[in-house]
Amino acid sequence: MQKLLIILILFCILKFNVDVEGRTATMCDLPECQERCKRQNKKGKCVIEPEMNIVYHLCKCY
C-alpha cells in the first residue's frame, strides 16, 4: 500500500512539473502543414503564437 502511495505522489509531482515547464498547447507538423496549404495553392508555415501562459504552434497558409 505504501509503494502505491509513493508511486502516486511521484506521478503527481512529475505531472505538475510538465504542466509548469512545458505549456505548449498544439504542435505544428511542417510537412503536414505544407501539404494542407498546397491544396489551397498557398505556402504553409508553422508559427508560434503565445497567449497568456500557453504557447501555440499553428499552421498558417500564406
UniProtKB/Swiss-Prot annotation:
Keyword list, A-Z: Disulfide bond, Ion channel impairing toxin, Neurotoxin, Potassium channel impairing toxin, Secreted, Signal, Toxin
Site (Basic residue of the functional dyad): 45
Positions of disulphide bridges: 28-46, 33-59, 37-61
Protein's cellular compartments: Secreted
Annotated site residue numbers, Aromatic residue of the functional dyad: 62
Tissue-specific expression: Expressed by the venom gland.
Predominant subcellular localization, coarse grouping: secreted
Signal peptide: 1-22
GO cellular component: extracellular region
GO molecular function: potassium channel regulator activity; toxin activity
Protein's UniProt keywords contain Signal: yes
Recorded superkingdom: Eukaryota
Domain note: Has the structural arrangement of an alpha-helix connected to antiparallel beta-sheets by disulfide bonds (CS-alpha/beta).
Protein purpose: May block potassium channels.
Family under the similarity heading: Belongs to the short scorpion toxin superfamily. Potassium channel inhibitor family. Alpha-KTx 23 subfamily.
Protein name: U10-hottentoxin-Hj3a
